[in-house]
Each structure stands twice: as C-alpha cells, then as structure tokens.
C-alpha cells in the first residue's frame, strides 16, 4: 500500500492546480520517497474515476476547493477502509480548509509547511451528511439565493466571456457581482420544516413564501463567515439557519466584517441544531451542495431528507 495520493484539480483557483505537481515533487524531495506517493490530475467525474481506488492509500490529499473535496468525500463515505483526507486549499471556496485551520497555515507558511503537517497526520473526525441518501456532503447545503448565485456561476464559467472577466477580476470578485445580480431573489413558495430535537421529538415549522434562503451547515465557516457559535463538526449534528429577510441577509455581510458568528449579532435569528431534517414544499428553486449546483432536488413537489450518515478523518495542523 502506498502512503499518499495527491489528487489535483487543474482548474481550481486561477488554474493554480496546473503548476502544483512540480511544486509538490520539489517540496517532497528528500522528505518522502517518490515510490511512496502518486500525483494525479482529477477528471470532472471524480466519483467514477476513483471508485474503490482510494482504499489503496493511507492518505488522499485533495488540491482544490470545496467542490472537489466534496466529490472525494462522496467516494470515501462508501469505502469500508477509509483513507485519511488531506487538503491543499487552492479553490475559489475553501470553507472546510478554513474551518480546520489548514487555509491559514497554507497562506501564512506555504506549501512546504502544509505538506509536513499532512505527513505528520494529526486528524480530527468530521461528520458526513446526505441529502435523500443520494447526495453526500461534508460542508453545507443551500436552498434559495446562495444556490441561485452558484447556479449562475456554474452556467457562466464555461463561456468564453467568463475567461475575459476572469482575466480582470478573481473568482470571488465575480461571485460578488453575481451576489448583487441576485440580491432580490426569494424562495417563491411555502416551506414546511420537520426536525428532530434533543428529546427525539419532531418539531414542525411552517415558513411562508418569500424567505431568502435555508442553509444547512456542518462546517464552522460558510462562504467565509461563521453562522453559528455552537458548531462542532464531529458531534453528530448540523446547524440549520433560515435567512428570512433582506435585513438578515445584510447581517451576513456584518458577520464577515466583524468576524463574529451570525447568531451573536442577529436578534431572533431562526437557527437550530439537529441530526435529522425534513423539508416539504411544492415549487422550483435552486439548490447547491458544497458550492456546486444541484438543481434537481428542488423542482416540483418535494420531500427532502437531510441526516448524518457517517464520518471521515481529516488532517489538521
């Protein structure tokens, strides 16, 4: 069994992944024998590319953003022998890496220091969630305005005009423009929420049409901000936050600027923890999982079920 597989998304960030392979080889020279690791570029369909293959390694290091990591977590969740997960955060969204301290280490100390930490292999367990037992994720699920932004980004990023814009501004800058474009988007139907409380009783909440978004999070950081001061990634629970008004949506910006969790600055915020959530609605809206669009779960008459299904080991500083 080999020790490490480095899996690089060549399209991550501003194509940083295309040059990363040589940097990894250089940093590992004299540190780890070349026969103990492999470096590969990921295909778009990672789940098919690496199904039942990752168990051949002790550690799988993903160089990419939250979307790439989510695809690998999807594979790891189904394995009997799960490798440890390492992260080189080079994506547009790096919320998981930010939540566990890897992003700060990478930005402040560089690739060499990060590879050393990965080889030391200090780990923490994080919960893995599923949507309808079909879509597996570790970070967050968004329904509404944030998913509309992700959908627009995915639709536009493959067009030639996007390459022109990308040469002038960063992906995050482009996300900012799309945020302004979708500032008035609302979920156009009523939503019923059923969740299991700490006493294993079912609570039912009805939300009228016109709310901005529903965000289900397992990570401490979501879109660069903290939503909940109570978040733990290994407690078998996840946080549910409902952004009902424009004012609460503006508070998301305050949370970023003030570097404080949203629940500490927004009065009467609808937020709770659970290990099982059911959403019932009839209508069409947008859905994103770990920053990637998933429109299919949010069309027509729907009953969506979110629950914790397993966990995986992630390397931390």
Question: Where are each of the predicted segments found?
Answer:
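Short amphipathic alpha-helical segments
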Residues: 18-20, 73-76, 98-100, 227-228, ...
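Glycine-rich phosphate/pyrophosphate-binding beta-alpha loops
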Residues: 142, 146, 215-228
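ATP/nucleoside-binding phosphotransfer catalytic cores, i.e., glycine-rich phosphate-binding loops
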Residues: 201-208, 227-317
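ATP/NTP phosphate-donor binding region
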Residues: 1-63, 70, 74-77, 111-116
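Histidine- and/or cysteine-centered catalytic micro-motif in compact active-site loops
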Residues: 196, 216-221, 243-247
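Catalytic core of DAGKc-family lipid kinases
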Residues: 5-7, 16, 78-213
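Short N-terminal binding/cap micro-motifs at the start of the first secondary-structure element
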Residues: 13-17, 222-224, 313
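Short glycine-rich anion-binding loops that position phosphate/pyrophosphate groups of nucleotides
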Residues: 65-68, 90-93, 143-144, 219-221
């Amino acid at each position: 069994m080999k020790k490490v597989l480095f899996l690089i998304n060549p399209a991550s960030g501003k194509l940083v992944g295309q040059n990363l392979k040589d940097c990894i080889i250089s940093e590992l020279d004299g540190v780890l024998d070349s026969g103990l690791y492999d470096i590969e570029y990921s295909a778009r369909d990672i789940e098919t590319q690496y199904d039942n293959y990752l168990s051949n390694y002790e550690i799988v290091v993903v160089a990419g953003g939250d979307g790439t990591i989510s695809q690998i977590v999807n594979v790891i969740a189904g394995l009997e022998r799960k490798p440890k997960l390492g992260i080189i955060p080079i994506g547009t969204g790096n919320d998981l890496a930010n939540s566990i301290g890897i992003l700060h280490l990478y930005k402040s100390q560089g690739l060499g220091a990060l590879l050393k930490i990965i080889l030391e292999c200090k780990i923490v367990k994080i919960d893995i969630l599923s949507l309808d037992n079909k879509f597996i994720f570790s970070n967050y699920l968004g329904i509404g305005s944030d998913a509309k932004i992700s959908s627009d980004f995915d639709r536009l990023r493959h067009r030639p005009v996007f390459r022109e814009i990308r040469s002038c501004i960063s992906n995050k800058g482009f996300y900012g423009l799309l945020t302004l474009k979708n500032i008035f988007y609302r979920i156009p139907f009523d939503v019923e929420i059923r969740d299991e409380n700490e006493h294993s009783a079912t609570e039912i909440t009805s939300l009228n049409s016109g709310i901005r978004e529903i965000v289900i999070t397992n990570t401490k950081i979501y879109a660069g901000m903290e939503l909940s001061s109570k978040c733990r990634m290994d407690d078998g629970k996840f946080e549910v936050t409902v952004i009902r008004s424009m004012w609460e949506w503006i508070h998301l910006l305050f949370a970023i600027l003030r570097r404080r969790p949203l629940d500490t600055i927004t009065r009467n915020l609808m937020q709770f923890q659970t290990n099982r959530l059911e959403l019932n609605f009839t209508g069409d809206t947008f859905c994103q999982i770990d920053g990637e669009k998933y429109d299919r779960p949010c069309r027509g008459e729907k009953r969506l079920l979110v629950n914790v299904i397993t966990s995986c080991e992630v390397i931390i500083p």
